[in-house]
Swiss-Prot record:
Function statement: Catalyzes the conversion of dethiobiotin (DTB) to biotin by the insertion of a sulfur atom into dethiobiotin via a radical-based mechanism.
InterPro entries the UniProt entry points to: Aldolase_TIM, BATS_dom, Biotin_synth/BioAB, Biotin_synthase, Elp3/MiaA/NifB-like_rSAM, rSAM
Pfam families for the chain: BATS, Radical_SAM
Manner of cofactor binding, per the entry note: Binds 1 [4Fe-4S] cluster. The cluster is coordinated with 3 cysteines and an exchangeable S-adenosyl-L-methionine.
HAMAP family named among the record's database cross-references: BioB
The family this protein is said to belong to: Belongs to the radical SAM superfamily. Biotin synthase family.
PANTHER family: BIOTIN SYNTHASE, BIOTIN SYNTHASE, MITOCHONDRIAL
Keyword ATP-binding recorded: no
Name of this chain's protein: Biotin synthase
Organism: Neisseria meningitidis serogroup A / serotype 4A (strain DSM 15465 / Z2491)
SUPFAM superfamilies listed in its UniProt record: Radical SAM enzymes (SSF102114)
Cofactor: [4Fe-4S] cluster; [2Fe-2S] cluster
GO BP: biotin biosynthetic process
Keywords: 2Fe-2S, 4Fe-4S, Biotin biosynthesis, Iron, Iron-sulfur, Metal-binding, S-adenosyl-L-methionine, Transferase
Length: 350
């Protein structure tokens, strides 16, 4: 059955699992308005009903083609429209990418995510990334790609190559989408998400907060994600990383409690999705990250770089996970406790 972009917005009568519902923006905003500790408590309860709260899924993200993107996203240093001193680079060599994936796996990552600064790939680009996907899959890792808007048949080609997840974020509240991006529409994102679902790929879809949006607009973003049908398997929540030269480099800092609220509301509205702490984590104190894990975050990017912005170094993440008695998801599922400690350096205490 073909899934149209309209059908991706969950209707009240469409319930793929018992917890599914249509989320009105006002109802999501009401969740944001709950007393902080009550909200965290509710989110933690829902998290524990669906996941082991001590397991954290580790992904590593690599930019395989950096800079020169024709899109004008106000938050992105890779846009050719912004003067960020980030030059356009050619696509990385396949062997170099595979070597990066090997290193990521050896350090405990279970998923290797690859991003390319395109509006959308050309057919020859799909051939190239398909070869890369096959090579990474050969290492025994999950694969995720973020390559922009897809034409007909491209998602099927990526699926055939072995791609597991396709990342395509909704970025912000649909009602303010054109305030942030002028070179594409919210409907264009929905169209590609429909192609991805029709091809049988898993969906990684989230957004960015801290772009001068209101709480109501944050609620609009979460509602638009929660009403995708089915809900995304993976939901990355990014905290804006301000980069000089981008239109948002002077954005007002988002209060840390508001970010934690966003994580909690994402968990409540998308109970079976992996909620990932994504960009902006390098500026988050350990206590703030701990609150995010308590509120339902159960995935992080592992490695010292996210596309072009910084990320906590692996040693710091190991120390934090040990302090919080958290461990990587991958090896626990295989029952290999010794492998957890060997690959990630994190001591597992059951």
């Amino acid at each position: 059955m073909t899934v149209s972009p309209v059908a991706l917005r969950r209707k009240t009568e469409c319930k793929p699992h018992p917890t599914a519902r249509y989320w009105k923006k006002c109802d999501v905003e009401a969740l944001f308005g709950l007393p902080f500790l009550d909200l965290i408590y509710q989110a933690a309860e829902i998290h524990r009903q669906n996941f082991n709260p001590r397991e954290i899924q580790l992904s590593t993200l690599l930019s395989i083609k950096t800079g020169g993107c024709p899109e004008d996203c106000a938050y992105c240093p890779q846009s050719a429209h912004h003067n960020t001193n980030l030059g356009k680079e050619q696509m990385m060599d396949v062997d170099e990418i595979v070597e990066k994936a090997k290193i990521a796996k050896s350090r405990g990552a279970s998923r290797f995510c690859m991003g390319a600064a395109w509006r959308g790939p050309k057919p020859k680009d799909v051939e190239t990334v398909s070869a890369i996907i096959k090579a990474v899959k050969g290492l025994g890792m999950e694969t995720c790609g973020t390559f922009g808007m897809l034409e007909e048949g491209m998602a099927e080609d990526l699926k055939e190559a072995g791609l597991d997840y396709y990342n395509h974020n909704l970025d912000t509240d649909p009602d303010r989408y054109n305030d942030i991006i002028h070179t594409r529409r919210h409907e264009d994102r929905m169209d590609t998400l429909g192609k991805v679902r029709n091809a049988g790929l898993k969906v990684c879809c989230g957004g960015i907060v801290g772009m001068n949006e209101t709480r109501a607009e944050r609620a609009g973003l979460i509602a638009s994600l929660a009403n995708l049908d089915p809900q995304p398997e993976s939901v990355p929540i990014n905290r804006l990383v301000k980069v000089e030269g981008t239109p948002l480099d002077d954005a007002e800092d988002l209060d840390w409690t508001e970010f934690v609220r966003t994580i909690a509301v994402a968990r409540i509205t998308m109970p079976q999705s992996y909620v990932r702490l994504s960009a902006g984590r390098s500026n988050m104190p350990e206590a703030m990250q701990a609150m995010c894990f308590m509120a339902g975050a159960n995935s992080i990017f592992y490695g010292d770089k996210l596309l072009t912005t910084g990320n906590p170094d692996e040693d710091g993440d190991r120390i934090l996970m040990e302090k919080l008695n958290l461990y990587p998801l991958q090896f626990e599922l295989e029952g290999e406790v010794a492998e957890v400690e060997k690959a990630s350096g994190i001591k597992v205490d059951y």
